[in-house]
Design a protein with these regions (language model features):
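Active-site mouth of glycoside hydrolases
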Residues: 1-116, 124-149, 155-181
């Protein structure tokens, strides 16, 4: 029943007519792509491994369903990458190998993933940057293995000392962004 409701929601959004320009999203040239979800996962830890084949089939079937509704637009998963695939490159690759998936996505959140210190990013900035850049390279290589493009569709780093104050420094974040954009 949940999957039926999910597909109803997909159909509603894809066929919705934009209230401003009157164009259905499926026909709107400004809509490049659809994603299955934000950060879909087969599970959140090693206990998710038994779910992988069901997840992989869900990716294939759902991407195919979207493709039927929107054949002129691209389809991807919305995955955060290997980090959201039980940490396994093979799971990430297999989920994106479906012919219904046009390109790979991945996200990069080094503080969330404990590659950098949330409250003091500068303390582990060098090692966090090294790990982040290696993560990018891994995903570019995986996409090449599948012969598909990839998109780093989310990334970020906190202000210095984890502050939300606009007056707080962004030294570590600036260095992080420079490294990511240079890659």
């Amino acid at each position: 029943q949940a999957q039926a409701w999910y597909r109803d929601a997909i159909r509603t959004v894809i066929t919705r007519r934009n209230s401003v320009n009157g164009i259905a999203y499926v026909d709107d040239p400004t809509v490049m792509s659809w994603q299955l979800a934000n950060e879909p996962r087969p599970g959140s830890n090693a206990g998710g491994a038994p779910n992988f084949q069901v997840y992989r089939q869900w990716v294939h079937d759902t991407a195919g369903f979207i493709r039927q509704l929107a054949p002129r637009q691209l389809v991807s998963t919305g995955s955060e990458g290997a980090k959201g695939s039980l940490g396994e490159d093979d799971y990430y690759l297999l989920a994106h190998a479906s012919p219904n998936v046009d390109y790979l996505t991945f996200h990069l959140w080094p503080s969330n993933w404990d590659w950098m210190d949330h409250h003091d990013p500068a303390a582990r900035l060098d090692s966090g940057l090294e790990t982040s850049l290696a993560y990018i390279d891994r995903h570019v290589q995986m996409a090449a293995r599948l012969g598909k493009p990839t998109v780093l569709s989310e990334f970020g780093l906190n202000r210095d000392r984890g502050s939300y104050d606009p007056a707080s420094g962004v030294t570590a974040r600036d260095r992080f962004y420079q490294a990511i954009y240079a890659r």
